A protein has these predicted regions:
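Residue(s) in the substrate-gating loop at a strand-loop-helix junction
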Residues: 157
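Active-site helix of classical SDR
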Residues: 137, 173, 181
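Short C-terminal tail/terminal secondary-structure segment
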Residues: 2-22, 162, 250-251, 262-275
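Short, small/polar-rich loop/turn modules that mediate ligand/substrate recognition or access, typified
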Residues: 189, 194, 261-263
Length: 275
């Protein structure tokens, strides 16, 4: 009789315990993170500051930035809250001057069928999630080129690789961001600058939590069924990814070991795009 099968490790559907994380000293480097007041941006700002970077934390939410600054006070790197609305494109570009590491993260979401999608919201989504990253990269590259080193990390999404119904603006913006990131990689390579996307699936963030009601209305189901029947229906790992997990991937792309990685997308989707 064969022995019964035993588990070979932790349940992949459960988040792993917090580990020490990557060891990387970013002392002397300046990082800029957009959408830093919450979610993925907050996690990235704190992780980079923990590695010693001077972090410009950009957001339009003053209260969230104030909370973030308090959380970062004991970390090795300095964190500077910067109140900025990314629809002010000239100000966005100017804010990126002198940046060594740029994390384009800010985003917004509205779930509606195309025929009901407000054109002004579509325009705002594309402005914040595609045109602003272009302007920020444009503002950061002269300094990066001048010193022969730079890291551009664009927080994309599985929706930069695949489409979903009712998300026309978000999907269009993320697909555009993937193309912008690849172009920056090709242009930046001779100057020591890498550009990559980190493309997570559904992350435990306020943005995802806010869209559950919209998804329920769009699909005609109760909100409590959205996670299992819509968001995670096609994922192999049936859980939301944590913001800290995304931040570790961002940090990895700033390590010397990742210097040959450019023009690609690091997908953290629990197998969502394997179909």
């Amino acid at each position: 009789m064969s022995a019964p099968l035993t588990a070979l490790g932790p349940d992949p559907a459960e988040p792993l315990p917090r580990a020490a994380g990557l060891a990387l000293d970013l002392t002397g480097r300046t990082a800029l993170v957009t959408g830093a007041a919450g979610g993925i941006g907050r996690a990235c700002a704190l992780r980079l500051a923990a590695a010693g970077a001077r972090v410009r934390a950009v957001d339009r939410a003053a209260e969230g930035l104030e909370t973030l600054a308090g959380e970062a006070a004991a970390l090795p790197g300095d964190l500077e809250p910067r109140l900025l609305d990314l629809t002010d494109l000239d100000a966005a570009e100017a804010s990126a001057a002198g940046t060594d590491i740029l994390v384009n993260n800010a985003g917004l979401q509205l779930v509606r069928p195309i025929e009901e999608f407000p054109p002004d919201v579509f325009h705002t989504v594309l402005t914040v999630m595609l045109e602003a990253p272009f302007r920020l990269i444009r503002g950061a590259l002269p300094h990066m080129y001048g010193q022969g080193w730079g890291r551009v990390v664009n927080i994309s999404s599985v929706h930069g690789l695949r489409a979903s119904a009712f998300k026309s603006a978000y999907v269009a913006a993320k697909h555009g961001l993937e193309g912008l990131s690849k172009t920056a990689a090709l242009e930046g390579a001779p100057h020591g600058v890498t550009s990559n996307c980190v493309s997570p699936g559904y992350v435990r963030t306020p943005l995802v939590e806010r869209q559950i009601a919209d998804q329920a209305a769009a699909h005609g189901i109760p909100p409590e069924r959205v996670l299992s029947e819509v968001l995670l229906k096609d994922a192999a790992l049936k859980r939301l990814i944590e913001p800290d997990e995304v931040a570790e991937a961002v940090l990895y792309l700033c390590t010397p070991q990742a210097s040959f990685i450019t023009g690609t997308s690091l997908t953290l989707d629990g197998g969502w795009t394997a179909h």
